[in-house]
Amino acid sequence: MELVVKSVAAASVKTATLVLPVGENRKLGTVAQAVDQACEGAISAVLKRGDLAGKPGQTLLLQNLSGLKAERVLLVGSGKEEALGDRAWRKLVASVAGVLKGLNGADAVLALDDIAVSNRDAHYGKYRLLAETLLDGEYVFDRFKSQKAEPRALKKVTLLADKAGQAEVERAVKHASAIASGMAFTRDLGNLPPNLCHPSYLAEQAKELGKAHKALKVEVLDEKKIKDLGMGAFYAVGQGSDQPPRLIVLNYQGGKKADKPFVLVGKGITFDTGGISLKPGAGMDEMKYDMCGAASVFGTLRAVLELQLPINLVCLLACAENMPSGGATRPGDIVTTMSGQTVEILNTDAEGRLVLCDTLTYAERFKPQAVIDIATLTGACIVALGSHTSGLMGNNDDLVGQLLDAGKRADDRAWQLPLFEEYQEQLDSPFADMGNIGGPKAGTITAGCFLSRFAKAYNWAHMDIAGTAWVSGGKDKGATGRPVPLLTQYLLDRAGA
């Protein structure tokens, strides 16, 4: 779908469908009043009959109104006079998109300037959410269906904006398009079956991306290099699999050579059986999503490349498959990490932190401004925060605050959990420097505490996206593309874009 921005009178546009808002009590805004005048009061006459109450998301389609060049007028309820919240605004836009998809029109014009969204400016903030909602709603994953989804008639949507705000709306659409593209790539990777999407496949995807962008350098570390670097924890996770582990390094140079990079670290467990600590069979198919941390880093990089942000960014994808076999790691094994610290592996299903801890040590060589790791790390995070909010921890209050703010601005929220020193004691082991689990209490926090021991050399934050990376079951089952909006917003803020 193509999104364009224009500053013209709604009453004069030639389109298959013109979309106008109607408030509760059938109140028309300034733009809709002008259109109503052009069609000699046909809209207000329909509203007087009570066919549309104006509640948020309600729609009414009118055909062939005289005096207009639009073939149809779609009225959408915008609620009471007070501003809509983010969720209500997204639902309204999705409602409009649902109607437009059912029509045979190739284009539509949205004249929604009269709707206010709380805590969003009238141009960039409001239209960024609108554009992301429209574009993300276009996503379809039917690669393995013998019958593909039918092509949609709607190819182009024009957003009408006043002249004063047109440039900001265009900037919003530009950013939203890049974010939606990154989310779609993330969702594609997450939704792929694990027999195809394994560590080597992700490495090939990285190389293809590197070929397409001169500013991006790609290096793939194989299992021998991982072992030679002393990454005993990372190497241990992949021991039971026929698919060898890979550490994928993507280095984007968009800023000055002397600028310190931001580093994103993604957990890329392409399938997680739990290893010898085998998971229950029910729902195990969804463990293909255990690489969504790496996928979201990949998607964020795609957005950064599309926007050509003037920053330096290093993406580290820690990829392995966690399988049981005669060569797999056992509960009770002790490994030495790249940092020199030793870990007693008490549960092989707590493997994400093992690939991440060595990758966090590896990140030191880039002398980063900040390091953010993203992982589907703990089921405890789903218990704590559900599927709406990502967990967030870190060792630097400014960094954590910046990420929380980015989440609010991108409508991709996170919530901070503590890393109090008392929680560290739960990781004590009688045989090694630490265990890889901290008991049944505060599982998300103790996982963060574990990682914090490998991130002391720089400002660091950890995002647990176990509840937000995918939707379980039902017709909407699949990867969500989160937290690409939050991460991209954070980098947009750092770039001053």
From Swiss-Prot:
One of its GO terms (cellular component) is cytoplasm. Mn(2+) 1 binds at residues 272, 349, 351. Its cofactor is Mn(2+). GO terms for biological process: proteolysis. It is found in: Cytoplasm. Mn(2+) 2 binds at residues 267, 272, 290, 351. Presumably involved in the processing and regular turnover of intracellular proteins. Catalyzes the removal of unsubstituted N-terminal amino acids from various peptides. This is Probable cytosol aminopeptidase. The gene is pepA.
